[in-house]
């Protein structure tokens, strides 16, 4: 589940991923050719397409620092800002513990009493490739995650859309993993318009217990406010509308999305490869021949 405090502290299939993803979008450049100044990160990569501008901060967990369309910022700025990758798990892991067969693993408890949102957001990523409207980044899985592997994240910007892709691969033993994104979309775009509206049709809602973890029961979707995981059998499809200003659709082939709207300045629509605590309840194994892959597209159009 999303957590307003955690940020400030935070689809299976396809062929091999890792650096091969970078090769799909072009050759590798050096970091120096793609850096610009940013107050939160000495090394930022900026992509442009039409009037859309994206800033990626590889040293700050490879999060999106800014997404501007026609000069208007769409993502919250400040302590909990932008959009960060959730990897190698999404949401909360109960008491920070997961099991892989007979092996028991303890993760850092960074949202007591649970572990939340993975380690990728706390890690500096390497720039594998960057050009005007696309870039790819990697980092190697290491302690406190107990298995070696590699994560690749690809950004592809168009004048009316942003496509994000992420892959997790093992370089040794198989292991369970999840991946997804945690964007902080501005509730109000600050141009005198109305607050955002969130529209979606879910097949089920993961019932949330008092410990903020799914109980294991799937229930009929409830009205908001939400800090909840929803299931969409045909893939994630959520529309954010700032009336008279902008419409943005978040889509993904993945079935799960967490929606969070408790924060006064932002809302979260988080496509992810499995439900919270899924390392325990719905483990998806990453194997040498079957990496984990997930992607999401954010497509927008102006309404004014």
Would you name each region that the model predicts?
Residues 99-103, 128-133, 156-161, 189, ...:
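A short, structured loop/turn motif at beta-sheet edges
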Residues 1-17:
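Extreme N-terminal basic, low-complexity initiation segments
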Residues 54, 58, 139-183, 188-190:
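Acidic, contiguous internal or C-terminal segments within carbohydrate-active enzymes
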Residues 21, 28-34, 108-159:
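Extended, loop-rich substrate-binding clefts of extracytoplasmic carbohydrate-active enzymes
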Residues 52, 116-128, 197, 215-288:
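Acidic/His-leaning functional-site neighborhoods
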Residues 21, 26-29, 34, 174-176, ...:
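Active-site/ligand-binding surface loops and adjacent short beta/alpha elements
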Residues 17-105, 236-252, 290-304:
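Beta-strand-rich N-terminal accessory domains
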Residues 154-165, 283-295:
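Acidic/histidine-enriched ion/cofactor-binding microenvironments in catalytic or ligand-binding pockets
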């Amino acid at each position: 589940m999303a957590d307003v405090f955690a940020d400030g502290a935070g689809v299976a299939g396809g062929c091999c991923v890792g650096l091969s993803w970078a090769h799909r979008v072009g050759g590798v450049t050096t970091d120096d050719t793609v850096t610009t100044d940013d107050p939160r990160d000495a090394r930022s990569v900026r992509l442009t397409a039409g009037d859309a501008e994206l800033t990626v901060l590889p040293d700050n967990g490879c999060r999106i620092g800014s997404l501007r369309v026609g000069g208007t910022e769409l993502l919250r700025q400040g302590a909990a800002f932008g959009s960060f990758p959730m990897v190698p798990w999404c949401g909360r892991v109960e008491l920070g513990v997961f099991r892989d067969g007979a092996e028991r693993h303890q993760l850092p408890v960074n949202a007591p009493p649970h572990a939340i949102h993975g380690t990728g957001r706390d890690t500096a990523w390497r720039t594998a490739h960057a050009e005007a409207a696309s870039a790819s980044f990697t980092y190697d899985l290491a302690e406190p995650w107990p298995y070696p592997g590699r994560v690749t994240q690809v950004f592809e910007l168009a004048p009316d859309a942003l496509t994000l892709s992420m892959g997790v691969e093992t370089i040794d033993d198989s292991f369970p993993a999840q991946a997804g994104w945690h964007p902080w979309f501005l509730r109000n775009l600050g141009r005198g318009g109305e607050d955002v509206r969130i529209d979606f049709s879910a097949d089920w809602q993961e019932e949330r217990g008092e410990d903020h973890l799914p109980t294991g029961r799937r229930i009929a979707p409830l009205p908001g406010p939400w800090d909840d995981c929803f299931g969409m059998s045909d893939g994630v499809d959520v529309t954010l509308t700032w009336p008279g200003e902008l419409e943005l659709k978040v889509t993904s082939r993945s079935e799960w999305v967490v929606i969070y709207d408790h924060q006064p300045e932002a809302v979260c629509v988080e496509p992810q490869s499995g439900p919270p605590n899924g390392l325990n309840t719905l483990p998806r194994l990453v194997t040498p021949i079957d990496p984990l892959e997930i992607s999401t597209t954010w497509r927008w159009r102006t309404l004014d």
